[in-house]
Amino acid sequence: MIFDVKAPILGFETIHKMRLQKIDEIFLRLNSTEENSVVSFTLVNPFALRKYEFEVPTPLKILLELEGAKSVLVANIMVVQTPIELSTVNYLAPLIFNLDKQLMGQVVLDSNKYPHYHLRENILSHTHE
């Protein structure tokens, strides 16, 4: 599914369309669709790994048309390492997808409001919760 990027991923502000592909129940792949840009992210379903909740800021709710949306997906960027146990997840800057309208964006959470989320957390750090 191809999404219009309404709130850019930090560092990738020139990318306006991205393709999301489900790998399995936990992992997804996000790729740029622009010919002059080869950007690819591995995403992870945070709810499969830990308790995870946050408030979406009102401006992002408006940009992504989340009010009344029936299908919303939250995913986090993962840095894959070998072995997989060394991989890290960015819980402080989740991606939000409005599947109904094919809109997406990244929200950067306030680390003071969410001190239990970090930019680089080991993928296994919450598996025993």
Swiss-Prot record:
One of its GO terms (biological process) is regulation of translation. It holds the Pfam family FliW. SUPFAM superfamilies: BH3618-like. It is found in: Cytoplasm. Keywords: Bacterial flagellum biogenesis, Chaperone, Cytoplasm, Translation regulation. Signal peptide: none annotated. Disulfide bonds: none annotated. One of its GO terms (cellular component) is cytoplasm. NCBIfam families: PRK13282.1. Interacts with translational regulator CsrA and flagellin(s). Acts as an anti-CsrA protein, binds CsrA and prevents it from repressing translation of its target genes, one of which is flagellin. Binds to flagellin and participates in the assembly of the flagellum. This is Flagellar assembly factor FliW 2. It comes from Helicobacter pylori (strain ATCC 700392 / 26695) (Campylobacter pylori).
